Amino acid sequence: PAATVAPVGRLRPPDLIIQDELHLITGALGTAVGLFEVAVETLSSWETTVGAPVKPLIVASTATVRNAQEQVRGLYGRQVEIFPPQVLDVADTFFSQEVPIDDANPGRRYIGVSAQGVRLSSAEIRVSEVLLSAGQLLLDKAGAAADPYMTLVGYFNATRELAGMARYVVDDVQSRVNRPRKDSGFPRRWGTSFGLLNVGELTSRIASSEIGQTLDHLGLEFDPDYDTTAATLARIADARAGKKPASRKHSPFDVVLATSMLQVGVDVQRLGLMLVVGQPKNTAEYIQASSRVGRDPSARPGL
């Protein structure tokens, strides 16, 4: 049959734009995004028959509402309405309710370390040593239940601070966990990288391909039949006796150091231990970064 051609008007532009993770669009990134938003809004706007402009509605989610008015004005040039509004009981906002902490819902525990009169680097080394050695002790006693606390995630405000800690981990921390003090009560920690600590990094100075591999390896769990002190000593004895010790293709990370890149896109259920170095710049960083550990609160509470 013959086709019928009829003139049609322009398709109606989008009426709704949803922006997730608004709190991350700050600084240089916010400046660049603000320029693109002008073009997006122009292409998404239209006029009624009487010439009245109609712009799309923008709904944005953010981890903090602090300075939200200034941020929205800078990005979109608009006024902002915040919801849910302030309520009388912060534990019940109608949209969300606070879950009480009990054995079934242990939540996350935040512990602050006040190291007055001690250099920050010394405090980092000492705390990292204790956390890594304690993880090995837990693995020897509890087996697979200790896996979430065998990988130490370090969070830093700047790459410069992270680079310094990366050097300390492979030097000072490595030496301390390999030779714990006799009165410490901690066993020796053999790293998963041929006896050395296996260290990963999530920063902008790492190639994209390596970041993908690091994220994949974050899901590798410690095996009580391979990583406990008894299992390690058994492999060493086999090697000395001329036997071929057991091996594995990929090894889990002992330490992962990260900057703000950790806040988004990292959803690894097994992680349960984080060391936050210094004071994060805002509340959103506390929420986003620390929520990367303890994502399975019923079985792996975060510390």
Describe the function of each predicted region.
Residues R292-L303:
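Conserved segment of the helicase C-terminal RecA-like domain
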Residues P1-R12, A258-S260:
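Conserved RecA-like ASCE ATPase "motif II neighborhood" in helicase/translocase motors
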Residues L262, V266-Q279, P301-L303:
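A short beta-strand element within the Helicase C-terminal
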Residues P56, V65-R176, G200:
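Conserved interdomain linker/interface between the two RecA-like ATPase lobes of SF2 helicase motors
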Residues L75, V90-S121, R188-V256, D267:
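Conserved motor-coupling elements within RecA-like helicase/translocase cores
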Residues P13-L16, P53-V59, S251-V255:
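Loop/turn-to-beta-strand initiation segments
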Residues E21-L29, V40-L75, P85-Q86:
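Conserved helicase ATPase motor motifs in RecA-like P-loop NTPase domains
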Residues E21-L29, L262, Q279, V293:
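Conserved Walker B
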